[in-house]
């Protein structure tokens, strides 16, 4: 009964280089066991990158858009809490280097590993990917929740 089925604990190996941003209501804890990683986030209306070095731990507050980037031969531990049945995760792409949403999908997440792939494939087959412009069905006008992009300290 180490965590009473309340946590997801998993190792992630590199490489992992993507353009999508994950939106989760709960906190995520990152620990780099081998190598370094970059964690681009959207905070205070602009993109910043948190560098997590080998041996470092970083707690990302909930509702912060983030895009973990790992190089080859890196290993990191990630701890997330189990989602409540009422919670929804999001996957979002932005227009170029702007904070304008290009494409997003919201879903209940019980297995991020298997549930991300269909959303990513949908994006790469989309008109939004082809044109780089948001389309009428690419953004939820009434998202389940609004990302909180202001709760990460500025010294990261």
Language-model segments: residues:
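Jelly-roll (double-stranded beta-helix
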Residues: 1-57, 65-156
């Amino acid at each position: 009964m180490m965590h009473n089925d309340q946590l997801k604990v998993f190792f992630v190996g590199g490489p992992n280089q993507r353009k999508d941003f994950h939106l989760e209501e709960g906190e995520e804890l990152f620990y780099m066991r081998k190598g370094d990683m970059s964690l681009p986030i959207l905070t205070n209306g602009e993109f910043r990158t948190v560098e997590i070095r080998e041996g470092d731990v970083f707690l990302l507050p909930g509702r912060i858009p983030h895009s973990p980037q790992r190089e080859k031969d890196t290993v990191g531990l990630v701890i997330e809490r189990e989602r409540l049945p009422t919670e929804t995760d999001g996957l979002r792409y932005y227009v170029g280097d702007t904070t304008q949403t290009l494409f997003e999908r919201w879903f209940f997440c019980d297995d991020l590993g298997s549930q991300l792939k269909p959303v990513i494939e949908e994006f790469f087959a989309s008109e939004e990917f082809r044109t780089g412009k948001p389309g009428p069905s690419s953004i939820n006008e009434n998202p389940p929740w609004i990302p909180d992009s202001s709760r990460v300290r500025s010294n990261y």
